[in-house]
């Protein structure tokens, strides 16, 4: 009996079955108390925790290089890639995730604009601003100043909202909007406001009688898809910059 119980305990020590030290201790303690004595048959279920995905497939271990302890897989698209340890501080991790999300969204818009713009006009994206007719009847200084003012206003609101969530969804902060409700955070998560204004097609929610209701399942799925496409777009833009340095366009590099 003792031999059999020891074998069972040894099997329960496998993280493959129990998924963690805490689960192993909870399951092994009752059995250890009964080693060498009569045991009363009881039913119990062993739950295997889902393995955390790694940015290096089929590789386990490696310490914080492969599986950083400060990345627990709770963030969308988190595969444990942080070789420089930038996310050790929770405050910095939150800021870097916000930065990744915003830069990724701009990169996705830029990649689409580069392909569509060149296909439509035939002008390489890195030469588009050199065409005086492209910005007529406005001067370059006028466009630059307008963009700085408008972008500065929007970015300042995003900056303030990051440190003081929902502070910008009030009437005084949105004077040109009929209701501040359009800018409220419907999902309760930073960077994913949702609502009719930011999700007019209700891709991450539903519209019931004109009222936006977020759908957690759809939102989680779309967050992972978005961050994956955002990372690909940022990588694509890096490649586009190298190609532009050689006087090539993305379509030209593909022989199109």
Curated annotation (Swiss-Prot):
It is a multi-pass membrane protein. InterPro entries: Chloro_AB-bd_pln, Chloroa_b-bind. One of its GO terms (biological process) is photosynthesis, light harvesting in photosystem I. Its main location: plastid. One of its GO terms (molecular function) is chlorophyll binding. It is found in: Plastid, Chloroplast thylakoid membrane. The chain crosses the membrane at residues 106-126, 134-154. PANTHER family: CHLOROPHYLL A/B BINDING PROTEIN. This is Chlorophyll a-b binding protein CP24 10A, chloroplastic. It comes from Solanum lycopersicum (Tomato). The lineage of its organism: Eukaryota, Viridiplantae, Streptophyta, Embryophyta, Tracheophyta.
């Amino acid at each position: 009996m003792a031999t059999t119980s020891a074998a069972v305990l040894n099997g329960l020590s496998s993280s493959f079955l129990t998924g963690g030290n805490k689960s192993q201790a909870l399951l092994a303690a009752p059995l250890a108390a009964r080693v060498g004595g009569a045991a009363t048959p009881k039913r119990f279920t062993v739950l295997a925790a889902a393995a955390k995905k790694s940015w290096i497939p089929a590789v386990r271990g490696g310490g914080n290089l492969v599986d950083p302890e400060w990345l627990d897989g709770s963030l969308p698209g988190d595969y444990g890639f942080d070789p420089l340890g930038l996310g050790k501080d929770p405050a910095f991790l939150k800021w870097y995730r916000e930065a990744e999300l915003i830069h990724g969204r701009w990169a996705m818009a830029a990649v689409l604009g580069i392909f569509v713009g060149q296909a439509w006009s035939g002008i390489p994206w890195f030469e588009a601003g050199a065409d005086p007719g492209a910005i007529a009847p406005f001067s370059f200084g006028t466009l630059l100043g307008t963009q700085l003012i408008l972008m500065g206003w929007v970015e300042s609101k995003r900056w303030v909202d990051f440190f003081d969530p929902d502070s910008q969804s009030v009437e005084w902060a949105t004077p040109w909007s009929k209701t501040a409700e359009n800018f409220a955070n419907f999902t309760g998560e930073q960077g994913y406001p949702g609502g009719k204004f930011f999700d007019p097609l209700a891709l991450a929610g539903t519209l019931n009688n004109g009222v936006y209701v977020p759908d957690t399942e759809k939102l989680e799925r779309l967050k992972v898809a978005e961050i994956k496409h955002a990372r690909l777009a940022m990588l694509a833009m890096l490649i586009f910059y190298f190609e532009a340095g050689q006087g090539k366009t993305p379509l030209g590099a593909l022989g199109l």
